[in-house]
Structure formats: structure tokens, C-alpha cells
């Protein structure tokens, strides 16, 4: 059976991340204001689901999903500010993959 895990940050996650990292944090049209309740959507299709809001609930929710004999949707709420790495920048090749967030550079005044 299929198990689905939605990493739900309430945004178009990779689009928001690109805008943050490559477009000077100019966010445009990335917040999902009308996103449906994923758990209720799963039930509408006839299978079980659960929403997790706290990291402390994740292990038990994953175990519940694995133990379910049929399909299962786990909707995990995550911070909209968490980024996902590795990623390939716009127009970049695989050998230009970004493996971690850019580190701030200290600039000293002369």
C-alpha cells in the first residue's frame, strides 16, 4: 500500500526557497492560503490520514502509518522557513548543486 508524507510548510516550498536564496528574499505568490486540509482530503478518498503539528508526535505517527494495512496520508506541519538541501539552482547543472545554506560572510570596514 502507498504511504504519503506531506511536508506541509503552507507555502510553495522550493519556489519560496529559490526566492529567498537567489532573489534577495523577494517573496511573491508563495503562500498557500487556500490549501485544503490534507487529512480530510485523504478521508474523502477513503483512506486514513493524520496531521502532526509537533516533532514529538512524528515517531508515533510514522509507526501508525506503517502499521496501517491500506493507504495512509501523513500531513506533517513544518516551519515555512526551513529549507531543503541539496538543490539545483535555476539554470544550474547537477555539478552546481547547492548542498547547504550559504554561510554569511563577515565584512570588515577599512
List the model feature ranges, each with a label:
Residues 1-110:
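Thiamine diphosphate
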